[in-house]
């Protein structure tokens, strides 16, 4: 779901992702940095493009001119691990969006609602 205050998205980690080979042999788990990147792609990047499109009243055909960059992460905490093949839900709640800068409180959870990790992410959005 998506509106001007929040976003919800999902991602399933494929069992053959390259990073599982070394993290860890015999017991693969999704690296924390990949979990942060997943939260950033949904919570900061996609959300930022949507908010800019709403703000500038862009048509869908103009959205390919938007550039959204993940710019910072703060206070991420991990409560669980993500196994290969697992589907996660990412939820982002807008703190603010001003002058192309988005600050969002983001959580990742399992399909059953159990929280995996959370933190504050920021992104910068520009119209090229």
PLM features: residue spans?
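HotDog/MaoC-like acyl-thioester-processing domains
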Residues: 4-6, 81-128
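Generic structural detector for well-ordered beta-strands
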Residues: 10-12, 77, 122-124
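Charged, amphipathic alpha-helical interaction segments
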Residues: 14, 45-48, 97, 111
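Active-site- and interface-proximal helix/loop "cap" or "latch" segments in soluble metabolic
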Residues: 30, 34-51
